[in-house]
Design a protein with these regions (language model features):
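N-terminal beta-strand motif that seeds the catalytic metal site of vicinal oxygen chelate
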Residues: 1-17, 44, 56-60, 109-120
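N-terminal first-folded block
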Residues: 5, 9, 13-37
Length: 120
């Protein structure tokens, strides 16, 4: 598994984007309503705006979400959500980390897998 993103909740999205632009010269590679994605080499930083700054998510890219999920749960990780296909084209599972950290295992689904899933 390789780390591929951090997902952070911020109170002031515009302020956070201005800070990353000023300090790191980082511009969003994606901007949606109340959220933005910045790229730092192979790592994505996902910023979501919310009133409470609560949870940080660390995402790991995996070739086999189900197998890696079983491995880390077998090592004592606590599951939040078991592996499932997500609408954004990945198979993902969520685990409870220390403090307010959530860990996400994310496996890219190819277009053929998504097409066959939606056909059934």
């Amino acid at each position: 598994m390789d780390g591929n993103h951090f997902h952070v909740i911020v109170h002031d999205l515009a302020g956070a984007l201005a800070w990353f632009a000023r300090v790191w010269a980082a511009e969003p590679v994606y901007r949606g309503e109340g959220m933005a994605v910045l790229r730092f080499g192979p790592i994505l930083l996902i910023l979501d705006q919310d009133e409470e700054e609560t949870v940080t998510t660390i995402g790991y890219a995996t070739a086999d979400c189900d197998a890696d999920f079983r491995t880390v749960v077998g090592r004592g990780a606590h599951a939040i959500e078991e592996p499932a296909d997500r609408s954004w084209g990945v198979r993902a599972a969520y685990l409870k980390g220390p403090g307010r950290i959530t860990l996400e295992l994310e496996q890219a689904l190819d277009a053929n897998a998504r097409s066959s899933d939606s056909a059934t």
